[in-house]
Amino acid sequence: MSIEVVDVRPHERHYGVYVVRFEDGTERIATKNLTPGKRVYGERLIKWGGDEYREWNPYRSKLAAAIVNGLKLVPIREGTHMLYLGAASGTTPSHISDIVGEKGLIYSVEFSPRVFREFMEKLVDQGRRNVVPILGDARFPYQYAHYIKGVDVVYIDVAQPAQAKILADNADYFLKPGGYVMLVIKAMSIDVTAPATETFKQEINTLKERGYEILETVHLEPYDTAHAMVIARKK
């Protein structure tokens, strides 16, 4: 038996994010579905006030986890152009697609051909025209530079060592002046022997050395262990 929705309201801080309240008192975040009637990863669809919303699961999306954990700055709005490195099968990009809308654009880079096919099936083939899929290796931005114009945000979520370096290298190519970077640090992908806090410091220092001001850092527990989200901007 499904739990009835009693209210949907805009999130107090984040554009394009909504808070859904259920009759049992629980609340979940959601985005307004750009392609009504279609799911991407089995998420709950919620109808309210003539609109359809997609529940945004923090156990499936690190950006959702950061928002639920109190992230204050999400530099994504309607019309934002973004480079997303490590698009995987499209869970988080799909919600960003909802937020940026038809005027926005998400260049989505994924390395694995198998996962890339899933991304195509779940997002592009279902009519999300603001998503540009790119099969490529985020370590080598010159390989896909001809596909991408300047972007407002570079976001990275890859299971690679040197995550901050990869992010900064891509930002050097594509980030507009005044733009933001969003770094998901996966500590265990960098050094399984070091404490996660030390790995976080190491990656943050890399961004600082590349000229970035760190605006915010949020840890993602309990949704993801040994993960953190960092928001930064070029000085």
UniProtKB/Swiss-Prot annotation:
Highest taxon listed in the record's lineage: Archaea
Quaternary context: Interacts with nop5. Component of box C/D small ribonucleoprotein (sRNP) particles that contain rpl7ae, FlpA and nop5, plus a guide RNA.
UniProt-listed HAMAP family: RNA_methyltransf_FlpA
Residues the record lists as binding S-adenosyl-L-methionine: 91-92, 110-111, 137-138, 157-160
Molecular function terms from GO: histone H2AQ104 methyltransferase activity; RNA binding; rRNA methyltransferase activity
EC nos: 2.1.1.-
Keywords linked to the UniProt accession: Methyltransferase, RNA-binding, rRNA processing, Transferase, tRNA processing
Residue pairs linked by disulfide bridges in the UniProt entry: none
InterPro entries from the UniProt entry: Fibrillarin, Fibrillarin_CS, SAM-dependent_MTases_sf
General function of this protein: Involved in pre-rRNA and tRNA processing. Utilizes the methyl donor S-adenosyl-L-methionine to catalyze the site-specific 2'-hydroxyl methylation of ribose moieties in rRNA and tRNA. Site specificity is provided by a guide RNA that base pairs with the substrate. Methylation occurs at a characteristic distance from the sequence involved in base pairing with the guide RNA.
This protein's record includes keyword rRNA processing: yes
Catalytic EC class: transferase
Biological process according to GO: box C/D sno(s)RNA 3'-end processing; tRNA processing
The protein, known as: Fibrillarin-like rRNA/tRNA 2'-O-methyltransferase
Family as reported in the entry's similarity comment: Belongs to the methyltransferase superfamily. Fibrillarin family.
Organism of this sequence: Pyrobaculum arsenaticum (strain DSM 13514 / JCM 11321 / PZ6)
CDD domains cross-referenced by the UniProt entry: AdoMet_MTases
